[in-house]
Regions:
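A detector for short, charged/polar N-terminal pre-domain segments
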Residues: 1-3, 70-71
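Short basic helix-loop element that most often maps to the first helix and adjoining turn
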Residues: 6-21, 50
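Secretory-pathway ectodomains
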Residues: 7-8, 27-28, 51-63
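Residue-level detection of the helix-turn-helix DNA-binding "recognition helix"
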Residues: 9, 13, 27, 38-40
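Short alpha-helical DNA-recognition segment
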Residues: 16-35
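Short, basic-rich loop-to-helix N-cap that marks the start of a DNA-contacting helix
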Residues: 40-53
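Short, charged recognition helix plus adjacent turn
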Residues: 45-46, 62-74
Length: 74
């Protein structure tokens, strides 16, 4: 399984977004996106809901991201 941080980065790049634009879309700080993508911290449940909604709106698969998040929470 790919790391959660790597999957978040790939998802953002699939959407052709900068960290700044992705942060605005999720209503989080750029620093938060940077910490997620560099495995400094993981998204909380509220952020995961925002990520899921973003994926659904942009036709980006969410299953692998969700599985990686659940695995890291255990």
């Amino acid at each position: 399984m790919t790391s959660l941080s790597g999957l978040i980065r790939v998802m953002r790049k699939r959407a052709l977004m900068s960290q700044e634009n992705f942060a605005k879309a999720l209503n989080v700080s750029v620093g938060t996106i940077n910490r997620w993508e560099n495995a400094k911290t993981n998204p909380n449940i509220t952020a995961m809901k925002k990520i899921k909604a973003f994926c659904e709106e942009n036709n980006i698969p969410f299953d692998e991201i969700e599985a990686a998040w659940i695995a890291q929470e255990e």
